[in-house]
Amino acid sequence: MKTRVLLTVVAGILLASPAFAQSDACDRACLESTVDRFLDAFVKHDPSMAPLTRTVRFTENGQRLTVGDGSWRSMIAKGTYRLFVTDPRAGQVAFIGTLREENQQNKDGAPVLIALRLRVERRQISEIELFVVRNENAAKNCEKLGTPHPLFLEAVPPAERMSRADLVKTANMYFTGMQQNDGKGVYPFTDDCNRFENGGQSTNVPPKPGETRADPKTATMYSSQWGCTEQFASGLLHFVSRIRDRRYVAVDE
């Protein structure tokens, strides 16, 4: 059975309040459309266009800001890469995608990569957590991917679904396996696993012409030519000394 776990920047799992009326519930379509409504308001520099609570909390790159400040002033258009992690049970949705930011050298704006979390209560946004990565190559690489891998968009048959707790546990094993990597951990990868970092493939990269594939048993540095398990089992990711503040804000069941 394949485990399909999406690793994003994402906060402790919050259960939706049973006190909410059924009419106030926000399903998958509702949550994802709320992201679009937020982004439309964001690139128009107009918070009044978004369904915000009066006490909405907004952070950007870890800093508490007033709604309308920060990147609200500089983003000018939505990009083309879109990946949702939607959790109706928690009333939260995470989004990884691209935007365009005003740029004097480019009238169409410079591409940026964002990670976004919204908490939605009674169909209004009560929390906005935004990370902006101003790395044009990363944003361009994501857009070159076109759409997310089909497995991320495929509904897992009910009989094959993991529990919320096991999904989080498996995702956390990725970070635990990378932190102070020694090659002796448990690495739950499928044989055809691939890793992508900032939109670029970092596993199973074919050797260049005339180049010999590095041997994970004898190499002294890890290689992007190896598969996921080979990289982790090599013990050569030990330069990642700590992965802290691990948070799982959305579990897409």
List PLM regions with ranges.
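Bacterial N-terminal signal peptides that target proteins for export
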Residues: 1-7
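Bacterial N-terminal signal peptides
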Residues: 8-17
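C-terminal and inter-domain tail/linker signature
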Residues: 21-253
